[in-house]
Amino acid sequence: MQNKGIVICVAVLLTLASIFYLSFSFATRYYDSEAAKIKDPIAQQDYKDSVKYLGVYSYQNCLETQIGLGLDLKGGMNVILEISVPDVLENLADHKTDAGFTNAMKEARAQEEANGGDFVSLFINAYHKSAPGHKLAEVFATQQLQGKVSPQSSDAEVEKAIRTSVQDAINNSFNVVRTRIDKFGVVQPNIQKLEGQQGRIMVEMPGISQPERMRKMLQGSANLEFWETYNSEEIAPYLQQLDTRIANGDNGQEEKDSVAADSTAAKKEVAKAEPKKAEAKFSIKKKDDAASKVGEDAQNAAAIKAHPLLARLQLGGGLSTVGYASVRDTAAINKIIYSAVAKRVLPSDLRLLWSAKPADNLKAKNIFELHALKVTTTTGRAPLEGDVITDAKDEFDQMGSPVVSMKMNTEGARKWAQMTKANVGKAIAIVLDGVVYSAPRVNGEIDGGSSQISGNFTIEDTKDLANTLKSGRMPAPARIVQEEVVGPTLGAQSIQMGIVSFVVAFVLLMVYMVMMYNIIPGMMANLALLVNVFFTLGILTSFQAALTLPGLAGMVLSLGTAVDANVLIYERIKEELRSGKGMKQAVAAGYGNAFSAIFDSNLTSLITGVILLITGTGPIRGFATTWIIGIVVSFFTAVFLTRLVYDYKLNHDKWMHCKFDTPVSHNLMQGKKYKFMSMYKTTFTIAIVAAVVFIGSFFVRGLSKSIDFTGGRNYVVQFENPVEPEQIRTVLGDAFVNADGTKATTGAIAIGTDGKTIRVSTNYMIESNSPTVDDEAETILYNALKKANLVSQKSVEAFKNPDVRQGGSIISSTKVGPSVAKDITMGAIYSVLFALIAIFLYILIRFRNVAFSVGSTVALAFDALTVIGFYSLLWGLVPFSLEIDQTFIGAILTVVGYSINDKVVVFDRIRENLKLHPKGDRQQLFNASINETLARTINTSTSTLLVLLCICILGGDSIRSFSFAMILGVVFGTLSSIFIASPMAYIVLGRKIKEEPAEEVAEVK
């Protein structure tokens, strides 16, 4: 063996690096166990702060360096944030209001929502249509782009400046998000910009148990504003007039030339009206019987018909508070106050915003204040903004209530003094991200640049708010377009199931290798598997990549790849021994002859893994990461490390009589002369019929699409007692109603076998960008289940807590926005197509014959169609979910990777025989090549199926669908190598297939 020194050096370096990085996990566990012996929590923390691992690394360093666990193993939160590129463009254009710009923005938004695409390109195309003959510089020669865009700039120069500014905004947003998470104290967060998805940032936060806080913190743009306000008495008459107009059927569709006159008349009418004062109170009456409930509903409907606005909004409150409303009515009120009628009736300089917290002066819960802000600038922006804030602290006021104190720079202090001096006796509203946090009365001029945000806050609220302000302002609003929350208890169960499936699969593989290849070769292969796991975990830890349940599956599957390499080598050694060579020569020839097949099969699998890593998100990336590492490590351990050991032993005249078979495997598929090429017409017919059935099933039954492809929310609810999915569907049938009055689509399927775990899916308000919709959906779910006596939790907070299992609770949740669903759909299609194209090209380059590329690609396409077809035929008929989600797409790509591995081995033997017998009969040559690799095919398929069955049975629900798809892929991928790929390659070679004689065909070799 050449280059032994390099192999030994790499092995030693990998060993030392793996020991070093894995040692942090053991150190952390040791320090935790020692700290647990200390009863005082403060003393516990002091002990952890004092430790120094290896004399250098603190306890926090150990936490951050130890092997990280993903959300499904540790619990936590995964979100994808989308930075609003349209808002960035509006900021760059200084919020221009000319028709060309606004129409172009509206058109670009509509096109992006319908078809996706690059928003900047969509906007520029729309602008050229809506403002023909006008240059982009007319819009973007602003203060924000000073030095980059001038009135004389060409459209190309402006586009370049816009794209640069958009990318800068995304980069700044990424930095702000990272700073906020660091201040929150999340250990081992994973924050990354998603390549190829402009404006999207993925954030993984293991161990997070307060998703509501994280949602607020991540989506807050820290857009702080100080506004002058109206008094409530000034605005009440306008709201009464608006209520009357809406009740009389005014829909705002009148002609434009009548608007001015109508507005003037409205103001005169309002001027005559006597302001109506209302006390700030809410009375909530409880009705016990069903008849009272029906009567109450009828009264409410009549009241809303007579007073669409004021039946929902109670006027009064004083200062800037014009009224109060229940949180459930805010959407309907917003629809009225932002309507075309409201634009004609309400003052043009009025801006109505809700309070951030429920009113603290009312006994009723979930009642919010509506504040009246006065626009005093020509641009419509606040007279004082958050860019003047230099510091923010969470403190307590004189009454002991939590507040946030802020300091301003010199310019901000000057403007603040002017603003407070001009508004003595009135309120100044402090607005953050479009909601009013406080609106205190100004008693006198405030100099020195000090201000304070007070309200109905908790200590956590003020701490998060101060951290958000200190982290900096987001250049554009960010919203969560995809979210997954996993409870820690569910994570612990996943760890247990993952470890059990891993250990059982590992033991079965070890037993199988010894059973098929005898003690010494079998144990050598098993030793390589152990080293494989050790190196994989070490490399994974050094990359600070989180280990997930799909990641564990990837590691287990990579063991199958390692076994395949050993099987190829051992089968080759057996062939050389049967040909009469000595042990040393047979081992050398076996490793040498198997190298090309191992290299090609591993590289094609690696191509698939890289595509998974690039196109996948969340669990798919975790699987791809460990699979890629496992493929590389298995190649090194199987091809080089085991060779070192064999060479060492054989050079010392040991293992000279080692056996590579057992009574079980001695004659396995030896001397077989199956005439596979004679069957191609039959097998092609069967394949075509199967394809027709599968395609027909797509049209008749379709596929069970998950929210990854439709958009929506999933809630995995664990009940105290067994329930039926149909019962849940009935209970939730009318519960989720969208803001426009339409029923949301709702579904329920059973998870697991205990009958107590149900996954509820709904597309309720999935198009809405409001941060309150998530809480609304969870509240609706709780109320519906509570009313049906299916859960006994006393509050929605307890129901949302994944650790409070008694009484029923949400143990995990997922949200996928519609834009993400479209991107996932297109990404899935592109990733599969790209994988097929990449493999086609690689096979063409390596085998230098298009026949092998065509044969493998057609067979791979059939493999993918077969797996998808079975999912279409079987969903709803098997006792586990067969939904099409991102994990399933990962399974399809993995099937492609495994299947091409098998085909490459067969094609490699055909290529070898073609070189040995260039003028031999092609039909006999193909048959002989397939027969010669049958033993390897059976051993590899069997060992891989053992692994997959362990994952499917023991690995848990989250990867059962994945493993089932892989089982189908292994079975049909193996068959397609023999009955589709090889005959197709033979046909494309251009040789006419001759009918074989009935008698035995002599083997080519």
What are these regions (language model features)?
Residues Q2-K4, V404-S405, N409-V424, I428-A429, ...:
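Interfacial segments of transmembrane alpha-helices in multi-pass membrane proteins
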